Amino acid sequence: MRVLVIGSGAREHALLLALSRDPQVKGLVVAPGNAGTARLAEQYDVDISSGEDIVALARDVRADMVVIGPELPLVLGVADAVRAAGIVCFGPSKDAARIEGSKAFAKEVMAAAGVRTSRSEIVNSPARLDAALDRFGPPVGDLSWVVKDDRLAAGKGVVVTSDRDVARTHAAGLLEAGHPVLLESYLDGPEVSLFCVVDGRTVLPLLPAQDFKRVGEGDTGPNTGGMGAYAPLPWLPDEVCQQALTSIVEPVAAELVQRGSPFRGLLYVGLAVTASGPAVVEFNCRFGDPETQVVLALLDSPLGQLLYAAGTGSLADFGELHWRSGAAVAVVLAAENYPRRPRVGDIVFGSEIEGVLHAGTTRRDDGVIVSSGGRVLSVVATGDDLSAARSQAYRIIGSIRLLGSHFRKDIGFSAAKGRIHI
């Protein structure tokens, strides 16, 4: 099997690495890729938002399956174009990808499916903003206001704050840009990222993970695309994941089938584990980054065959997933000034050692690897337990040099110390 992976981040590097371990995968292609993925796959620079260009590339490289990593091509309908060309695709249709592309649509689907989530309201007009803010946050007993961009925002469109002025400024800025605003009640509890492989009707959950969205230690500063992750979650009872599967993911998948938009791909549910059980924070239509890096590091089943089964509607016949023992930790090395406009073009030293997955990197004509984005690298390590995996990840990242770079030093710390309780 020849597999074409679409994307250029550490998530795609992790996908390629896991696919390379599948004995049935005989060839790997990536578009556009980065300086690290070039060691695993043929690379092509194409417009990944163009279904026509992706189909042409898939035909040229004789791909048996296309795996779409980022959300934007999915929301734009690239998976539809690939399937229409008769090529197996892992990734939802444009209609099904609305579960991430529009938070209002996701809320509508959850309501129809009877899924537990936060109370919410869409604000389309600045004139309605102040009254809407009065119905959320501390005025009604919530710890914080939760203000979200209804559209795609690369993980950076959310503000959670107890300061009304901060909430209002963020919401007003979104409205001024022409983006609807979603206000939500605050869900109190540790968060979980649960990935589920779905072929339309059959749902197969992967290991739960936890990511770290804020840029600063102690969950401070603005939101990012993700600064680190770990798996599995020693503090999470198995029954919570089972409850999430049967009361959240399966009903949502069934509702999408009912609407004529069956979901075929990776359905990612972000959960808050509250005192009353799991509740949905968000849905995404693709593998999350950096959680993918830790989940796939522990996967012992053949990834290519798993994704192909989902893409061909035969997931029910795949069988039980197998996992390696131990734990995995990913720590993101970010460029100076990230998550604002990052500094780029600096030489990255030590990026070609084992455990380093590339994201915002490119290779100059002289062969030197330089930074090209905000999240530059993901350092991934495994160990017998979370503490061992953390130690190894931080040992590796300590050997990498990039001018002005930064990373969080507390990824997985509370879990390793047994300080997370539900």
UniProtKB/Swiss-Prot annotation:
Its cofactor is Mg(2+); Mn(2+). It holds the Pfam family GARS_C. Residues 107-312 form the ATP-grasp domain. Its EC number is 6.3.4.13. Gene3D superfamilies: 3.40.50.20, ATP-grasp fold, A domain (3.30.1490.20), ATP-grasp fold, B domain (3.30.470.20), Phosphoribosylglycinamide synthetase, C-terminal domain (3.90.600.10). Binds 1 Mg(2+) or Mn(2+) ion per subunit. Pathway: Purine metabolism; IMP biosynthesis via de novo pathway; N(1)-(5-phospho-D-ribosyl)glycinamide from 5-phospho-alpha-D-ribose 1-diphosphate: step 2/2. GO terms for biological process: 'de novo' IMP biosynthetic process; purine nucleobase biosynthetic process. This is Phosphoribosylamine--glycine ligase. It comes from Mycobacterium leprae (strain TN).
